[in-house]
Amino acid sequence: MSIATTLSLAALFAFGFTNFLWKLATPSKPYQPSYLMIQGITYIIVMSIIHIIQTHPFTTSPKLASLAVMGGICASMGSFATFLALSRGGEGSKVFPIVGLNVIIATILSIIVFHEPITIQKLIGFIFGVISIIFLTR
């Protein structure tokens, strides 16, 4: 198994657990921005520790900073919408599969922007992804 696959699986479990914690928090009706801000502060602390351990200089560029800000805005909006859906009575077993379709958007954008090849395997994956969401949300 490649390191990329291993790290992808680690991310799968970490994000899955994060989503479960969001659902776990919703019965107490938290104010979503405060919950997500605490989560964001925790993110900054963990990334700072990783940065210190790696002893790599902090570097950025205007382009990279712009991409990070746009990504932060999108992630904040997506997190807030997901959390709001859960706190408004959305079942995790329905909300998470729908939100999980975000990989299709990222894949389509990668194909368009980076000219990645469209393979039969990817097309079948898209079809199965959509079909799985239909089954999981009924």
Residue ranges and their predicted role:
Residues 102-122:
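C-terminal transmembrane-helix exit sites in multi-pass transporters
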Residues 48-52, 111, 134:
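Membrane-embedded alpha-helical segments of multi-pass transporters/permeases
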Residues 11, 99-102:
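Structural signature of transmembrane alpha-helices in multi-pass secondary transporters
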Residues 1-15, 24-73, 77-88, 118-120:
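Membrane-interface interhelical linkers
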Residues 39-43, 102, 128:
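Transmembrane alpha-helical core residues of multi-pass small-molecule transporters
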Residues 20, 80, 107-108:
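Residue-level hotspots within transmembrane alpha-helices of multi-pass secondary transporters
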Residues 121-137:
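Hydrophobic transmembrane alpha-helices of multi-pass small-molecule transport proteins
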